[in-house]
C-alpha cells in the first residue's frame, strides 16, 4: 500500500516556477506507517509542466476502462474546472478551462449562510448579466493556448457587487459554462464522448 498526497495548494505560480502546498508528507508517513508519495505539482513544474491539473492520468484510466470512442473528454468541475482530452492515439491533454465552483461558492458565502448553490437552484432563478459576464471573459487566460493552469487567487467576484444573489449565481455559473465551451472548442476534433466529474456535475444550471 501507499498514499499519494498532493496537499492543499495555497499558492500556484507555474510561470514563476513554484507551487506551494500545505501538508507534511513525512509526518503522514510516520503516523500511518505507510509509504507516502508527494510533491506532484512541484516536481511537474521542475520538469517543464504546469503542476496542474493532477487528474488527467486518472481520467485517462477511466476513459480506457470504459473503452470510450475517441477522441473523448472528461471534465472535472471542482473549485477550478479542468479538462482531459484523449486523442485517438490515447495521448492526453490536460488543462484548467476556468473557474468551476470556486467563485459561485465564494458568492454564496458572501451573501448567505450557505456554502454553495445546491443543485444550481438559485442560479436557475436568476439571469446572467451579459455585460459583467463579458468582462470576466475578456481575461486573456481564456484565449491562451494549453497547457495552462489557473490559481484561485487569480479569480475574484468583485464585479458582481451590483447584482442580487440570484443574478450573481447565474452570471458565475454561466461563466463556468462559457469557459468550458471555449476550451472544448479549442480542439480540432470535437470529443465523441464527454464525461463529467466533481461537485459541479450536480449543478443543474451548469448541466442545462
Model-derived features: positions:
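Conserved ATP-utilizing enzyme core subdomain
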Residues: 90-181
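Phosphate-binding/catalytic loop of phosphoryl-transfer enzymes
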Residues: 14-19, 34-114
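Glycine-rich phosphate-binding loops at beta-strand->alpha-helix junctions
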Residues: 10, 191-208
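Generic structural signal for well-ordered alpha-helical scaffold segments
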Residues: 59-64, 177-185
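Phosphate/pyrophosphate-binding loops at sites that engage ATP/ADP/AMP, CoA/4′-phosphopantetheine
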Residues: 1, 181-191
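Short beta-strand-loop/turn "lid" adjacent to the catalytic site in phosphate-handling enzymes
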Residues: 1-25
